[in-house]
Amino acid sequence: MSVIFRATARRQKPLYRRKNNISIMKRQTRTTTLVCLCLAMLSSSISAQTKQPLRIGVAGLTHTHVHWIFSSVKNGDIEITGIAEPNRELAERYADQYNYPKNRIYKTLEELIAAENPEAVAAFNSIYEHLEVVEICAPKGIHVMVEKPLAVSLKHARKMQQLANQHGIFLLTNYETTWYPTVHQARKLMQDSSAIGPIRKIVVHDGHQGPKEIGVNKEFLDWLTDPIQNGAGALTDFGCYGADLSTWLMNGQKPVSVMAITQQIKPDIYPKVDDEATIVLTYPESQTIIQASWNWPFSRKDLEIYCRSGLITAKDRNNLSYRFQEKNKETAVTLPERKPPFQDPFSFFKAVVRKEITLEDNDLSALPLNVTVMEILDAAKRSAKSGKRIKL
């Protein structure tokens, strides 16, 4: 019996050890519950932040693309927290048109930021002023989106890049064509259809009859036709589209050289800047021709991609055609709008800032790609002035 008793005794734990184990288990349960609760609260907080509109300040109203941001408010992704515009009459004109509260109009960007504390700023002033916007916003951690192109010069662009990287902000460039379903489908067809071979030539047509001819307002026309404020004429205004698309389609590759010819076909209307520009980008195995003009018979933004044995044409925002192999007939399609947030610049801006999507270096809006765009435009201006091909 003593043997049986000893065996049983070994199996039983002392009472104080059992109580201690129970206490430990309770503490572990409470800790686990607390951790789960904290994670749930954090997740809820992140989700709530994601659902809140991005608070954007507007820097300047002299670029008429500013109508775009007012129209985008209805999507629910952004809130315009304030407007910085020194021209009070112009600011009140927009406020009246869009029923915007006039007590949120400020004379300077610094005043707007101090009063409204925006998360981000969208610049709709002259291209020359883009640098100043970044100089004000970057040290404060405020993200920035500018209208195309990134900067008035390569020097400005590199300074803006340095500030954005130093202070960890997003700096995006908005192009109308970035939101075209056709350009994205063209790239997808090119990538998916290996049978058509590599790119041999890209031809980009952008422009309209001329800014004065289409009736842009005086505030826009004044700086758009100023070589200091705009950097050039049609070369800057519409050459940037082709440089952006070409760099994107070439997966970030820079051209070997740039050659440009500019003209003043209407010097009586545009005496200070070019109104016609042709830019040729030479790559090791392909070529891009950018035709930027204020002399087209109608507005156009279209793109042709010639591959070894196929042609893809983005005719406008929604209409695309393609022909693969000489024996095949052309196929034409009409594309629906892209899904949110890829259909609108400000929905996209919000998604980038809130880190709902990842902005890649070769994205059409991304800073590295747009610095390359500025290298191309800088070389194009130097080429047009010298009559020589510029190597990059």
Set out the residue ranges of the language-model regions.
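Rossmann-fold dehydrogenase core element
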Residues: K159-T177, R200
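Contiguous beta-strand/loop segments that form the cofactor/metal-binding neighborhood of enzyme cores
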Residues: G242-N319, S347-E356, A379
